[in-house]
A protein has these predicted regions:
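Extended, hydrophobic alpha-helical segments
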Residues: 1-34, 38, 42, 46-47
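Short, intrinsically disordered low-complexity segments
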Residues: 35-65, 70-78
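Short, low-order "capping/linker" segments at domain edges
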Residues: 80-83
């Protein structure tokens, strides 16, 4: 399935910058970077659960945010790429 992950990590503190590096590195290992904080991840259901869990553990929910867009297995008709 295709899952698009977008994140915003507060980097005002040293801990925030460390969280950002951790989230970015994990996403880079799992998916393809589309923008600085947006990744396209082709995963199965089990990998998706691990992805979500690991990212939830990495952020500070009071300062940071995550978004998961679940496009499923038939995502080709839902995604248009120009340029």
């Amino acid at each position: 399935m295709l899952v698009v992950v977008a994140y915003d990590v507060n980097t005002e503190t040293k801990e925030g910058r460390k969280r950002l590096r951790h989230v970015a590195k994990f996403c880079t290992n799992v998916g393809i970077r589309l923008q600085n904080s947006v990744f396209e991840c082709h995963v199965d259901a089990a990998e998706c659960k691990v992805l979500k869990h690991r990212l939830e553990q990495a952020i500070d929910t009071e300062r940071d945010s995550l978004r998961f867009y679940y496009l499923g297995n038939r995502y080709q008709s839902k995604v248009e790429h120009i340029g």
